């Protein structure tokens, strides 16, 4: 029978600091409200009839509290060496991993805030996490350098038991960082969704880490908990203000900060495949959105659902374009997606020619297509429920289905 593992002292200190971080986040966000509005870092909620100015980029506050917690926490995992001198040799590789991870997250918070202020283009959004992930990749190279993977059972007759990916493994880790930071950013647009999905993912990772504390990779999962516990509580404080009806917007800063934090623990904690499984809804949303993200199908600047002021419910938003402007590939994708029930396509004509409309290709709009118009709060709850189901499926795969592919 599984017993709850004994927590080391640094984790208890981390938990206490995280609880203080929750209080600090809840307190600081309303305290800085006026400063953000005065700096014109504010906007209107397009899904509300009210045109009140709401402060944006509040992820920078939860991110700053997160960093302060971990900066103050740095000495505690190494107290035996600092104070009692009981260790034979200082664990430099653990110290470098901690500092390198903090550097990557700190860079991403800074670059995310720059994006909120400067309103960068999408091509820049791909470059920012790539640059911020370089310290992370260097830490992995100097501390571990292992690029060999265990081949799944069905492929072993062809590739053997182990396969050295070499530089491709670093490309994979860099792409993982880019995906994590942008995946949360493109599944957004309604109150509480960005912070809510991040909260569910972090809670799932914490549970996974605790279960694995009695395993062979205890130190890696303790390292992950050092980051996930404060992230969970600072995000909870942010969600308190971002929940419907939202009093603040989290901004791209939070999406980048959350994504890089997940990438850090997934890469340095050596469970990147499990990490990706926790991103199931985000992976589906990304694949579903690809035709618009690649501009095969015209993509408007905002793809969030639209408010029906008469019913007070959110409905699907649409992309409208001239039919003749669509390429052969775009036409083919539209027809296939429509036949599969993934898109609503409408055709019309006026004096300017023939036009085509299709709902914007996001998971949010797809749920509205399947379940019909719904209240914004209920839509957020449905999406978070889907995230929880994704985590449950991940645990089933990780501890049951994995036996079909690996020797565990």
Swiss-Prot record:
Coiled coil: none annotated. Glycans are attached at residue 146. Dolichyl phosphate binds at residues 125, 178-186. The chain crosses the membrane at residues 11-38, 59-78, 92-118, 122-143, 167-186, 193-213, 219-242, 251-269, 272-293, 376-400. Residues 39-58, 119-121, 187-192, 243-250, 294-375 are cytoplasmic. It is found in: Endoplasmic reticulum membrane. Belongs to the glycosyltransferase 4 family. UDP-N-acetylglucosamine--dolichyl-phosphate N-acetylglucosaminephosphotransferase that operates in the biosynthetic pathway of dolichol-linked oligosaccharides, the glycan precursors employed in protein asparagine (N)-glycosylation. The assembly of dolichol-linked oligosaccharides begins on the cytosolic side of the endoplasmic reticulum membrane and finishes in its lumen. The sequential addition of sugars to dolichol pyrophosphate produces dolichol-linked oligosaccharides containing fourteen sugars, including two GlcNAcs, nine mannoses and three glucoses. This is UDP-N-acetylglucosamine--dolichyl-phosphate N-acetylglucosaminephosphotransferase. It comes from Bos taurus.
